[in-house]
A protein has these predicted regions:
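Metal-cofactor-dependent catalytic cores
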Residues: 1-295
């Protein structure tokens, strides 16, 4: 039974993990997330992930997805063009303690990231950086603690293929900020893939399924885990300045018992119907989704 309806108001793809996102009008759903989402990841000399948590200036790297390449731009840098379907030698990379195969993207990309992200705001030298592309033959699964029997695949996301957030949740946060005399923030700080309008603030926390009819058939997304929040939302996506105010405000009302009191905002989601290696439907801004709430 459908309990309500919501409308897709925004779609976001993040080609390079921890860099800026691309707002799109339509996106292809794959069994590993939106097409091209978190395909690439910046790594240090040891192959470990580099992110805005330590290097907030990554927020200033702006991607542009085109038919055959992605173009990266950053202040003071020439544009870097990455072919969508070309890689170099295989490498091993590490993400949250998981070691996995990937492909190096070559010396030009490595030098570009090393030049722009040469050191942290604290002056700590990062050393040489490399850019890696996810190996699509590798199967990286979400935690079955939250997905149950569903084998949900990921690329370089933190752990789940989709992140869903309601527009009203951000508006509610901004209302709280305003009462304290602070300016508004936008949802880019929370890095969602699918933004919904038409449901109340944080109703995504209580949704059991989001469904709609694509041209290929019925599609079902299942929110499975609250998205726990590290300090990354404190990074201003326009300036890369860091201010802990946002975390302080979230701490006052978004401690989640399901996460032992950690801050949550938005829901990680998986596909349970209608998407496979053979079937990859489009999702468009303006699509109306059927919302079923948890009992």
């Amino acid at each position: 039974m459908t309990d309500a309806q919501a409308t897709v108001s925004q779609l976001w793809v993040y080609p390079v993990k921890s860099c800026a996102g691309v707002m799109v009008q339509e996106a292809t759903l794959t069994d590993m997330g939106l097409l091209h989402d978190r395909c690439w990841m910046v790594v240090d000399a040891h192959g470990e992930m580099v992110s805005q948590r330590d290097v907030p200036q990554m927020a200033l790297i702006q991607p542009n997805l085109r038919l055959s390449d992605v173009v990266l731009r950053a202040p003071g840098m020439l544009a870097l063009h990455l072919a969508l379907f070309q890689v170099q030698e295989p490498v091993k990379v590490q993400l949250w303690g998981q070691i996995m195969p990937a492909f190096d993207m070559g010396d030009v990309a490595a030098q570009w990231f090393s030049d722009f992200l040469g050191q942290t705001p604290q002056g700590k030298a990062l050393g040489p950086l490399r850019l890696a592309r996810f190996d699509p033959d590798h199967v990286r699964l979400s935690s079955t603690q939250w997905t149950g029997t569903v084998a949900a695949k990921n690329q370089f996301s933190d752990g789940y293929p989709y992140l869903v957030c309601s527009q009203a949740s951000v508006e509610d946060l901004n209302a709280r900020l305003a009462t304290q005399g602070h300016g508004a923030v936008d949802l880019r700080r929370f890095r969602p893939n699918i933004v919904l309008s038409g449901i109340p603030a944080h109703d995504e926390d209580h949704v059991s399924r989001l469904s709609w009819q694509a041209e290929e058939g019925a599609v079902v997304l299942q929110p499975v885990k609250p998205c726990s929040r590290c300090p990354m939302p404190n990074v201003d996506p326009d300036t890369a300045a860091v201010n802990p105010l946002l975390s302080d405000v979230l701490q006052s009302y978004r401690q989640d018992r399901r996460l032992d009191g950690a801050i949550s905002f938005g829901m990680n989601a998986i596909v349970t119907q209608g998407v496979s290696e053979e079937v990859e439907p489009l999702l468009r801004v303006g699509q109306v989704l059927n919302v079923t709430y948890q009992l």
